[in-house]
């Protein structure tokens, strides 16, 4: 998504080794939600995993996530149990956001929910069929209504640097 690091080159190398790995790259930052939607459009597999590239989400959970899909869940999502390592002001505003959203919305938005999740093709197709222009995926995941298994883990420190403007933009 307009990243200036070496992520795109690394993904291209992975694609050379495994054609199931694909890169969706943009010339500029188009925003998280639009980037997620573009990734869903590109994904063709029976299962789709979504995770941040900054390693805050433990890839080691994938086998466990897949085992729950095999047990019949449509989606396996993750949430952090603490906000350890996060700036206190960001934690405060995040908690307030979830509290307010859950008061005014009929769709539950899980506090601490991460974008890291594994979904069946049916879930992804349902999301893609929505005509929403301004998307909020955490709300959409709840709204489409598929059975979701939640896995919890401790918050990890991001390998990217957060700046004050980034905190306010997020």
Short names for language-model regions:
Residues 161-170:
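Single conserved hydrophobic/aromatic residue that forms the stacking wall/gate
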Residues 28, 53-55, 153:
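Short, conserved catalytic or interaction motifs in soluble domains
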Residues 50, 78, 151:
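Short beta-strand and adjacent tight-turn residues that come in two discontinuous sequence segments
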Residues 146-159:
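Short, charged cytosolic
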Residues 13, 20, 24-28, 32-42, ...:
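Acceptor/aglycone-binding surface of glycosyltransferases and processive sugar-polymer synthases
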Residues 46-54:
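Short beta-strand-to-loop acidic/aromatic patch adjacent to the donor-nucleotide binding site
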Residues 143:
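Flexible glycine/serine/alanine-rich "lid" or loop that lines and gates the nucleotide-sugar donor pocket
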């Amino acid at each position: 998504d307009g990243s200036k690091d070496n992520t795109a080159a690394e993904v291209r190398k992975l694609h050379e080794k495994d054609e199931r790995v694909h890169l969706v790259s943009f010339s500029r930052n188009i925003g998280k939600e639009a980037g997620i939607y573009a990734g869903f459009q590109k994904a063709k597999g029976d299962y789709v995993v979504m995770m941040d590239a900054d390693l805050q989400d433990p890839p080691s959970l994938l086998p466990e996530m897949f085992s729950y899909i095999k047990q019949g869940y449509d989606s396996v999502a993750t949430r952090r149990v603490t906000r350890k390592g996060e700036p206190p002001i960001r934690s405060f505003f995040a908690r307030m956001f979830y509290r307010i959203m859950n008061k005014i919305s009929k769709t539950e938005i899980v506090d601490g929910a991460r974008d890291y999740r594994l979904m069946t093709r049916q879930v992804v197709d349902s999301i893609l069929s929505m005509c929403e222009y301004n998307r909020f995926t955490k709300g959409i995941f709840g709204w489409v209504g598929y059975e979701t298994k939640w896995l919890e883990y401790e918050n990890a420190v991001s390998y990217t640097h957060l700046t004050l403007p980034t905190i306010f933009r997020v």
